[in-house]
Amino acid sequence: MSKGMSEIISKGIIKAQNKVQNKAQNKEQNKEQNQEQFMLDKDEYRYRPWLFFLCAYFFTWIFWIPAIFVSEDKGAILMLLGLLAPAVVSTVFVLVSGCEELKRDLKEKIIGFYKVKWMNVVWAVIIYALIIVFSILFSLLFGQSLKQFSFTEDFSFTGVGIGSAFVTITLASIIEEVGWKGYCEDSIGQYMDWFIESLIFGILWSFWHFPLLFIKGTYQAGLMISPLYVINFFVGAILMGYIITWVYLVSDRSILACMIFHLFVNFMQEKIAMTAETKCVETIVIFIVTAIIVLLNKKMFFGTEHVGRLLKTRFGEGN
């Protein structure tokens, strides 16, 4: 082999080695840049979901449990204080967080009318109205009556001394959503996809109502005539957690949208003359609707782009 040929081969080998080295260096640099960008995109605030639930349960039940043993009038203030607890805990968690971004986020979620996708709220209301319609129709198979397509004269509970029953369900819809959407759901969603988040939240939110079963005058106390009705309430609440999470996300995490939907659900549950048996059928219908919503929004429920950077993520139609 000539000297010239050896030099050409040698230069070719060196060039190939340099190319491999440069490629490896560029790959390492890109990896470092991606890691740096990920750190920049991550939320600075660390959510504490389990501490929130401990506080929310404690400051609710510390008032509701004593309300079991007193008269309705005397228990009124205890009921109201317990109802306020999650919203107060949520607000305190945000205010003492030291995170201006979290404080601004809560403000926007509550009063940000511009965040509400009004047509999505309308569709959510229509969907729930259809759930009621189909539940009553299916209940005919179990001997129920078409007379359920009517409004009741009164609410099924007394309002527990907090004013009228309508005022009670209105307050519950507003106050609960400030607590659960103000901090709670985000604190879970920060660490996992929304499908698992909805399941965890639904279970914990459902069980939060437990003492109400034993407080005279409440809707839940009226269910104690049958274990089936009690179980149905808790299962239905878990499933509704998925639907209201959907309403929350398609309106870019608007609490106002959830308040409107929650109020409509509470009102329909009370004023439509469905029997307790039909409400058990309703839970089956809600399960079917929940499955459809999840399947049609797989990216929203199973995506993890928001994990670790929820405050920097925009939600809506495309999520």
PLM segments and residue spans:
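Residue-level hotspots within the lipid-embedded alpha helices of multi-pass solute transporters
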Residues: I169-I174, S206, F233-I238
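Membrane-helix boundary elements
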Residues: F195-I225
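Short, Lys/Arg-rich, polar N-terminal cytosolic tail immediately upstream
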Residues: S2-V20, K27-E44
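Hydrophobic/aromatic residues in alpha-helical transmembrane segments
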Residues: F134, L171, C184, M240-I244
